[in-house]
Amino acid sequence: PPPAHVVAKLAEVAAKPDAHGYSASKGIPGLRKAQAAYYQRRFGVELDPESEVIVTLGSKEGLANLAQAITAPGDVVLAPNPSYPIHSFGFIIAGAAIRSIPAAPGPDFFERLRLAMRY
């Protein structure tokens, strides 16, 4: 078992109401500043860490946030099928209609994609 002082500290922190939940939805400010500085050094791109940089808990959250940012209710979004659920559901939650593109092995996917974009 862990030492008693470790268990006591864990219980103390767990009892605090502000110790539960996720970080701020934009992410930790210092991390956002570091990301903006990296893009400046690496790519020569200036980003405002307060309005142009976010930190997500993973790619699914990032895709859902992207869908909310770029989709208006009624938009039609093309999504491969099969795919991970978030590829469609993030856009569905944002009010989009999903047009599935069958993603079978072989070179036909891009032709099916071109056809789907016509409608």
Tell what function each PLM region has.
Residues 8, 12, 49, 68-119:
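PLP-dependent aminotransferase-like
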